[in-house]
Structure formats: C-alpha cells, structure tokens
C-alpha cells in the first residue's frame, strides 16, 4: 500500500487535480472592474479618438472639460479637445481653400455652384471648430495661467491621414470630383489635420507623435503647449476675417484667448527664462496683433 500510494501514477493524478483546481479558481476570480464616471467617459473619448471618430471623442470629453469642481481627467480632456479642434480647424481651412480655388478656376457653372456650396459648408464647420478651440483655450488657460506640465493621454489614431489629399489638388485646378470622392477627401483631410495637430502638439512630426503616444500618453511642457495653442488660435481667427466670416467680434474673441496663451507663456518664462522661447512668444504676440487688423 505504501508503494501504491506514492507511485508515479498517483503523483501525476494529484498534480492534475491541483492544476485543474487552480484553473477553476482563476476562471472564477472577479473580472477587472470597468471604469465608471469620469474615468469611463475619458476612456470612451480615447477609444473614439483612436477610431477616428473625433466628433464622438468631443461628445464624451465635453462634460469632463467643463467639470466643476475639476476631476483628474478635466485638464486631460481639455488638452485632447484642443488637439481635436486644431485638427478640425486645419482640415476645414484646407477644404475652404481648395473649394474656393476650384470655384474660381472651373469654367463649368454646375461645378462652380457645387464648389461654392462646399466652400460655404466648410466655412461654417470651420467657424464652429474655431469657437470650440477658443472655448477650450479659455478653460485650459483661465486667468492667463497653465500648468508647468500637461498630459496628452490618448492612443495615436489607427487610421493615418495622407500627407496630401490628391482629390483636393484636382479641385484646386478646377477639375470635377464626384460626391463620394468629396466625402472621402473630407475624411482624409480631417485625419491629416489631426495627425498634423498631434505632431505640432509634441513639437515634432508625425513619427515623433506616434512614438510619444505608443504607451498611451505623453507629458508636454505647459510652455510649449501654450505657444502651440496660441498659434492655433491665430489660425482659427482667420475664419472671422474679411475674406471669410466677416465677424470682427468673434475674431477679437478668439484673439483674446491667444493673448491668454501669451500671458500663460510669459508667466512660466518668468520662473524659467529662455531666450528662444521668449522670441517665440514675441512672434506669437505680433501675429495676434496683425490678425486683429484683418477685420
């Protein structure tokens, strides 16, 4: 009996029972809890951003960005929204430019009418994006201040935009692009705009942005982001100049937020002087002053 109880067969039978018990215990353990509240909203925003659903990312991050009192996700949501609105501004500016030139170049009255309509529609979309960027800047730079370090927490979009949108090049020459190609060009332009916004936000190119976000987040200098945001606000303000929306009050509103970026940058530079950054702030301030004259 002693030998039977300690035979190799008995040993392996006991080992199998232990392994099965361990597997059952593991399978019955509690699942990792899903995030709730603000954490869930921000996770949804990141998921939508990765999928290129930037409109949905804005929806999920809206309440977070304006939360009072602020949560740990409020500032992160503001940074993410600043990037998205910047991408939207870039995209709509590109589309407006293409369809404006296309309408001027074409000899076909039907093409001209369609391109004029698209120019108008994208101008309106650009105005909305510009105001969204100004609102986000107001939240992030309230009182002309910004954190020394910010967090851009999001994965890089799974679909990368092209470096150039081929169909828009054809439009600029007055050539016709079918409606389905117009839609795909708009999507390509948006993906391109967001990719370029990410690159500028991390003070580099797309490759640097992709690398920086490989782990899902990256730290950004508050000074650099204030400069980035200020310059993007200048670009956004052009939607209200005499060539586009012709709205002096909104142009001033957007430029005022640009001045808040200047103040935020200057505050940080007082703590840590940097001649090169000081020159960049001066250049930004000059750009704002010049833009205010285009009413």
Task: Please place each PLM-identified region on the residue numbering.
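Residue-level recognition of tetratricopeptide repeat
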Residues: 46, 83, 90, 198, ...
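Bacterial N-terminal signal peptides
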Residues: 14-25
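Short coil/turn linking the two alpha-helices of tandem helical-hairpin repeats
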Residues: 87-96, 103, 166, 173, ...
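Bacterial Sec signal peptide processing site at the extreme N-terminus
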Residues: 28-44
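Short solvent-exposed coil/turn linkers within tandem alpha-helical repeat scaffolds
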Residues: 32-35, 64-76, 104-192, 199-205, ...
